[in-house]
């Protein structure tokens, strides 16, 4: 495939992603050899296309390509950990979490990722509450506040549940 044809396909993918037509975007993405692409933003977008189509293995492979080209990308490590969890690979997710934590310093997403891993392991509500409280104390996110309120309810902490709501 020459550069002109590649650029046309990439533009088509971008337009389809803009329209949330991930299925068609994936069909076009399947025709491209992503190992030759150096642009990490483009690789990340294509990985998202595969993820939206629940092809987590291909999404992970493409994110690994992006990570090889930008190994200091904590955003990529976070996404790789999320994909590993979606694939049910907790050990791999924990490895990415450790790398992410080493790079991230005090990024609040560390706590969120820790929560997601603990949840995947089936940890008790009290343990999940601690991680989610740490995250929501730094980041106001309605989705996670709601989930925290649900955990309070499960743990029998009705007063904290109402307070969070």
Language model regions located:
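TPR-adjacent "capping" and linker segments in tetratricopeptide-repeat scaffold/adaptor proteins
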Residues: 1-8, 31-38, 133-139
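Alpha-helical repeat scaffolds
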Residues: 24-32, 58-66, 90-102, 124-137, ...
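Short coil turns that delineate tetratricopeptide repeat
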Residues: 37, 71, 105, 139-140
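Alpha-helical segment of the N-proximal tetratricopeptide repeat
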Residues: 5-35, 52, 147
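Residue-level detector of the short coil/turn that links helix A to helix B
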Residues: 20, 54, 88, 122-123, ...
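Canonical tetratricopeptide repeat
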Residues: 45, 79, 113-116, 147
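Residue at a conserved register position within TPR or TPR-like alpha-solenoid repeats
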Residues: 16, 50, 84, 118-119, ...
């Amino acid at each position: 495939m020459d550069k002109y044809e590649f650029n046309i396909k990439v533009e088509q993918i971008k337009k389809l992603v803009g329209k949330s037509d991930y299925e068609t975007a994936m069909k076009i993405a399947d025709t491209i050899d992503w190992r030759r692409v150096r642009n990490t933003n483009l690789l990340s977008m294509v990985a998202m296309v595969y993820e939206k189509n629940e092809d987590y293995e291909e999404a992970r492979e493409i994110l690994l390509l992006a990570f090889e080209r930008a190994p200091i990308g904590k955003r990529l490590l976070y996404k790789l950990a999320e994909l590993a969890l979606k694939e049910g690979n907790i050990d791999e997710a924990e490895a990415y979490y450790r790398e992410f934590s080493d790079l991230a310093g005090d990024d609040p997403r560390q706590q969120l990722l820790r929560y997601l891993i603990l949840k995947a392991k089936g940890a008790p509500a009290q343990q999940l509450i601690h991680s989610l409280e740490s995250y929501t104390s730094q980041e106001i996110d309605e989705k996670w506040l709601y989930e925290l309120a649900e955990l309070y309810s499960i743990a029998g902490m009705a007063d904290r549940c109402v307070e969070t709501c």
